[in-house]
């Protein structure tokens, strides 16, 4: 339940997309070959009895433009995010999924989309970029920066975001003795369409 905050990490995916400027103007993101995941960690006095969570955040649509001022746009359908924890039984995973998509976390009925729009892409040397942009999640827009590297046509990177920056209070249970950390880690591997 508390790990539903991972959805915030999906927004960071858009950050790494800015690193794909080598593909040329107006290239779409290959959503079938690209991946993004959000890692949610536990904390609290009894966190040893809880689980960390991994959330799959499939990219619904994205575009990379390297003409003039490089840019990237990305969209994730929050309703398609999935809890992937294989060590958690099916019923518990379904409960975590419902909590993540419910009103207390992502509220996917009210905020079905997560988006990222770059504001700047800066080269940091061969095959490395810093991408800055705005992530919109849970109806709130916040600046997010990501370091991206490329190899063999893949653009990889990670970023950390805080749920509270997007108006989401991290899940707490048992009086706060088990809770989700405010900070989420987002990892991605992006491929531009050929």
Q: Across the structure, where does each feature detected by a protein language model lie?
A:
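Low-complexity, acidic/polar, glycine-enriched regions of mature
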Residues: 22-194
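Bacterial N-terminal signal peptides
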Residues: 7-18
């Amino acid at each position: 339940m508390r790990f539903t905050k991972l959805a915030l990490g999906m927004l960071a995916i858009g950050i790494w997309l800015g690193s794909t400027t080598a593909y040329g103007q107006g290239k779409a993101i290959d959503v079938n070959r690209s991946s993004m995941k959000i890692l949610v960690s536990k904390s609290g006095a009894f966190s040893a009895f809880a689980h960390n969570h991994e959330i799959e955040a499939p990219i619904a649509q994205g575009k990379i433009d390297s003409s003039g001022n490089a840019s990237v746009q990305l969209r994730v359908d929050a309703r398609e995010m999935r809890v992937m924890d294989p060590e958690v039984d099916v019923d518990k995973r379904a409960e975590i999924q419902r909590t993540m998509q419910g009103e207390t976390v992502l509220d996917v009925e009210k905020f079905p989309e997560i988006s990222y729009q770059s504001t700047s892409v800066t080269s940091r040397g061969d095959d490395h970029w810093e991408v800055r942009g705005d992530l919109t999640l849970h109806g709130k827009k916040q600046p997010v920066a990501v370091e991206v590297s490329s190899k063999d046509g893949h653009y990889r990177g990670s970023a950390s975001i805080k749920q509270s920056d997007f108006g989401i209070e991290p899940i707490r249970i048992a009086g706060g003795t088990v809770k989700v950390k405010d900070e989420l880690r987002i990892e991605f591997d992006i491929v531009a369409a050929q």
